[in-house]
C-alpha cells in the first residue's frame, strides 16, 4: 500500500511539470522571418476575441482529468509599432472523476502578456507567476508556434508543401529548484494538408530526431524506452534528503490547425501529445540504488477553438 501511495504521488508531481516548458523558449523570436500572403496574420488594432482551450489527460491509458480554460485577446501595438495580441486569462476549471474544481481565481491572477504572429513580433512564454496556470499558458503558446514563421509555416503556399527541420532543437528546462536537470531534444516538420476558399489547414509535428542531441545522465538512458526510437527526454527531481527521481524516455506531439485566410486567425486546432517514460524513484546522488522503477505514460488531447 505504501508503495502504491508513493507511486501515485510521484505521478502527480510529474504531471505538473511536463511538456511545453521544455521546447518553446527556443522558438520565441519571429524577427526577420517571412510573412505569408496566403494566410499570414493581419492584425486590426482594437480587435477583441476569445479562445477556449480544452485538455483531456490520460495516465497509463486511463482518464485522469480535463482542463477547460478561456482567454481573451486584444490587438494592440507596442512602442515600435509591431502588432501583438494582449492575452488575458478569464477562467479555468478542472473536471476529474470525482468533482469539478473552479480555478477562475488563478486564471484572473495571471498578468496580461503579449504574443504575436507578425514576422517582427515575438512568441515568448511569459514568466509563470501563477503555477496553476502553467499548463494552459504553455499549451496556448504552442498552438501559435505551430503556425508561426519560426517553424516555416509561412513558407507554405500550396497543398502538399512541407518543410522538415534537419537540425534538432535541444532545450534546457532546469530551474534549480524542483527540476534539477531537464532536457528535451526535438525535431519538427510542418505541412499544408489542405486549402479551401476561406481556410488553410496546417500539420505541425514535433518528434525525436534520428540521432540524439542529449548527453545522457546515466548509461541506461541509451536503451530506448520505446523500441526503435531514441530517448529524447531526461529529467531529475529531488524527492527528499539526497534522494532523486530520474525520468527519461520518448516525447512527441503534433498539431492540426485550421487558419482563416482573411485575417490569419486560428479558427480551431487540435494537439496530440504522448510521453512514454521510465521512472527511477528515490535514487542516490549518482542516480543509483533506486528504491524502485516504474514505467509511466501520459497522453494529452487538446482542442483550441475561437469563440
How would you label these PLM feature ranges?
Residues 1-35:
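Bacterial Sec-dependent N-terminal signal peptides
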Residues 29-307:
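Signature of exported/secreted
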